[in-house]
Amino acid sequence: DIRDFEVEGISIGDSLLDFVSKKKIENKEKGFYPSSKNFYIIFAELKSFETYDKVVVTLKSDDKLYKIYGISGAIDTYRNTKTCLSKQKEIKKDLINLFPNIKYIDSTFIYPQDATGESKATTTEFDFKKGALKVFCNDWGNTREIEKNSMDNVQVQLNSETLKVFINTKAYK
């Protein structure tokens, strides 16, 4: 079950209110998906992180309990694609060892938000009961790294089944 996984002690289904104040949540800049405002993404600012450099959560727009539908942890690899891919491979191997019968899909795609076509992600998606887990290596192109100060990073993303369906059917249509 995807809810058994944690990113910095936070799981799918938890309330973000257990970790930060309502005021902090409401004052955060929200990132919406291109085709729908049903869900939004915010950076979670906890006191400190043990494993990740950044943590991002996905919340439902009309939910005043701030239930977490998605959570991602990112480890910066400081514009080093080789390190990024190596770390992604290591995490993938660990997950396959933990779940030898789990189905997964490897893919690579170009990020559409980078008009230069230089930025890409190499991903492995594991399909779990009630959700999905993705391991990304985000390889940002040189132009985006300079203009947006983007960093290559390894990202572990947990999505509830509800969020997974939303992303696959409505978020980018």
Each language-model region and where it sits:
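Non-cytosolic coordination micro-motifs
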Residues: 1-40, 70-173
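Compositionally biased P/S/T/G-rich terminal and signal peptide-adjacent segments
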Residues: 42-67
